[in-house]
């Protein structure tokens, strides 16, 4: 009799373990990552400041909004005298990709979360006798630069790329330190994306 009671008390616990994953899988479709299946068990998890969440089962789950990418071009020449604010920020008037909308109309990328991000830029100088210098800025400080200064070449490119560790709300943009850019055929571009969140 005692063993029968013990067997009955175990049955509800076993049923709970078997039923809960089936219920959770109905709310969320599996996500395939490198040939393996990851099932998110909570369709409305509470997200912390790092973008991670914890389901009722105590499983830590990455938020699904980790897709971040932008790419923009400049369609006109860019001369510092034309910039009314005199910040020398390079503005890109045509946004080709802006997944997540984190690249602003002011041509500043604002990081939505902590992570490793990739940035690249390609700019062309306007005048043969001029040198251009472009800095990629992080929160107002230069991180990398690119130069183009061959006096015998009319259209010369300044190009660079970098991986950066960013915190949420960090701001990344391009600043023209010297010279003028050519943009009439979308020669100047600026792109970036989230490599992985932290």
UniProtKB/Swiss-Prot annotation:
GO biological process: inhibitory synapse assembly; protein secretion; trans-synaptic signaling, modulating synaptic transmission
Cited SUPFAM superfamilies: TNF-like (SSF49842)
Keywords: Disulfide bond, Glycoprotein, Secreted, Sialic acid, Signal, Synapse
Tissue: Expressed in brain with high levels in particular thalamic nuclei. In the thalamus, predominantly expressed in neurons within the parafascicular nucleus. Found in the hippocampus, mostly in the dendrites and somata of pyramidal neurons (at protein level). Very low or no expression in most other brain regions. Highly expressed in the ventral medial habenula.
UniProt KW Glycoprotein keyword: yes
Annotated localization: Secreted; Synapse
Signal peptide stretch: 1-24
PROSITE patterns named among the record's database cross-references: C1Q
Keyword Cell cycle: no
UniProt note: phenotype after gene disruption: Mutant animals are fertile, have normal life spans and have no overt anatomical abnormalities. They have a normal corpus callosum, hippocampal commisure and pontine nucleus and no other gross neuroanatomical abnormalities. Mice exhibit increased anxiety-related behavior. Triple CBLN1, CBLN2 and CBLN4 knockout mice exhibit impairments in sensory processing and sensorimotor gating, in addition to severe motor deficits, seizures and reduced synapse density in the hippocampus of aging mice.
Gene3D superfamilies: 2.60.120.40
PTM (free text): Sialoglycoprotein.
A cellular-component GO term for this protein: glutamatergic synapse
Domain C1q: 63-198
SMART domains named among the record's database cross-references: C1Q
Glycosylation-annotated residues: 26, 85
Subunit structure: Homohexamer; disulfide-linked homotrimers. The trimers are assembled via the globular C1q domains. The trimers associate via N-terminal cysteine residues to form disulfide-linked hexamers. May form oligomers with CBLN1, CBLN2 and CBLN3 prior to secretion. Once secreted, does not interact with other CBLN family members. Strongly interacts with DCC in a NTN1-displaceable fashion. Weakly binds to NRXN1 and NRXN2 long and short isoforms produced by alternative promoter usage. Interaction with NRXN3 short isoform is hardly detectable; no interaction at all with NRXN3 long isoform.
Function: Acts as a synaptic organizer in specific subsets of neurons in the brain. Essential for the formation and maintenance of inhibitory GABAergic synapses. Promotes the development of dendrite-targeting inhibitory GABAergic synapses made by somatostatin-positive interneurons. May contribute to the function of ventral medial habenula region of the brain implicated in the regulation of anxiety-related behaviors. May play a role in CBLN3 export from the endoplasmic reticulum and secretion.
Record-given protein name: Cerebellin-4
Provenance organism: Mus musculus
Native organism taxonomy: Eukaryota, Metazoa, Chordata, Craniata, Vertebrata
Gene behind this protein: Cbln4
